[in-house]
């Protein structure tokens, strides 16, 4: 199938204050998915979607995988993806978003290096599974959704407990990925580079270092990265830096110079220029914008055209 998307969109989501997850539930999410949307997107949070009914395809990186009722997908923060209903039909999906880094970091009985490796494994790829082939994980996901929907006493404690079991199941998927996942050669090949950016975005990053992290040549790395991520490596680095800047602007009292430095920009002018280039708004305007605080779903668009300079 010919590649149909030449743009990728970054969607910044925020978990409501005091909640464990962001849950998007109910009949508002019955729709024709993918209608009028011609690009992939990725998130700052782990996304889990459960399809109650409907048919179509999920795009995970370069893979087009059919879905039907009782399919569910697990998408790590940096994987470009989208959901498309069959033309002229609607589907009923419900969604939960999890700050996996925060949740795993609060697990007390593991060494920090072990926790870091757990996150790395869980974030390595995405999955589209069915309730039939993985009933345990399907039940856990539906359990989180029902707790979020009903909000009975102690529901947050219940969700935290279920999430702990989900992390175990995610790790088991990673252990057994050859059996349960479709092949995603390009995104798997560049996983080392994605990890490198996650840990070093605040530093100067050379493309040669990313290629080295994947054990391939720089020219081969550039080609594989663009095929897998629909953008150039430098675009991805900037998106991750801006994602971090959004987090700092939203959740800390750091000034703009501190945010720029902590996010990997060499100067405040470079930070302002790149922030406005991809968000079409200045960092100061973004921080003060009321729309960033009022919506249940904090939704910001960062579009990186392939070949964007």
Predicted regions span which residues?
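Generic protein-terminus/edge-of-domain signal
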Residues: 1-72, 79, 87, 112-114, ...
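A hydrophobic/aromatic-rich effector-binding and dimerization subdomain
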Residues: 2-30, 80-149, 168-176
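Amphipathic alpha-helical recognition patches that constitute DNA-binding helices
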Residues: 47, 154, 158, 232, ...
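Hydrophobic alpha-helical core bundles mediating ligand binding, dimerization, or RNAP-core interactions
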Residues: 58, 93, 137, 141-145, ...
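Structural motif
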Residues: 72, 91-93, 200
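A short, Lys/Arg-enriched amphipathic alpha-helix from helix-turn-helix/homeodomain DNA-binding modules
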Residues: 134-138, 160-163, 179-205, 209-214, ...
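Hydrophobic/aromatic-rich alpha-helical bundle segments in the mid-to-C-terminal region
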Residues: 152-155, 177-182
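Basic/polar phosphate-binding segments, predominantly the helix-turn-helix DNA-binding elements
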Residues: 169-174, 196-242, 254, 258-289
């Amino acid at each position: 199938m010919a590649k149909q998307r030449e743009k990728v969109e970054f969607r910044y989501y925020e978990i409501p204050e005091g909640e464990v997850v962001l849950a998007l539930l109910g009949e508002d999410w019955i729709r024709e998915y993918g209608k009028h949307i011609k690009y992939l997107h990725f998130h700052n949070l782990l996304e889990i979607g459960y399809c109650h009914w409907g048919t179509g395809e999920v795009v995970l990186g370069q893979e087009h995988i059919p879905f039907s009722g009782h399919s569910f997908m697990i998408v790590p923060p940096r994987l470009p993806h989208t959901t498309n209903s069959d033309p002229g039909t609607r589907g009923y999906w419900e969604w939960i978003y999890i700050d996996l880094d925060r949740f795993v970091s609060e697990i007390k009985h593991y060494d920090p290096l072990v926790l870091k490796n757990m996150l790395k494994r869980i974030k390595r790829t995405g999955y589209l599974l069915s309730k039939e082939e993985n009933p345990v994980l399907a039940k856990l996901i539906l359990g989180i959704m029902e707790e979020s929907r009903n909000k009975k006493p102690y529901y947050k404690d219940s969700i935290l407990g279920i999430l702990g079991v989900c992390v175990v199941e995610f790790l088991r998927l990673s252990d057994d990925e050859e059996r349960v996942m479709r092949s995603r050669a390009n995104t798997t090949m560049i996983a080392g580079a994605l990890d490198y950016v996650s840990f070093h975005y605040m530093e100067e990053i050379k493309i040669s270092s990313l290629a080295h992290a994947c054990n391939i040549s720089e020219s081969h790395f550039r080609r594989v990265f663009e095929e897998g991520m629909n953008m150039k490596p430098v675009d991805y680095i900037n998106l991750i830096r801006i994602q971090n800047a959004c987090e700092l602007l939203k959740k800390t009292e750091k000034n703009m110079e501190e945010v720029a430095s902590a996010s990997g920009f060499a100067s405040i002018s470079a930070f302002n220029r790149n922030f406005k280039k991809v968000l079409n708004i200045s960092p100061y305007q973004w921080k003060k914008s009321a729309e960033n605080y009022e919506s249940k779903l904090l939704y910001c668009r960062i579009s990186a055209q392939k070949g964007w300079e």
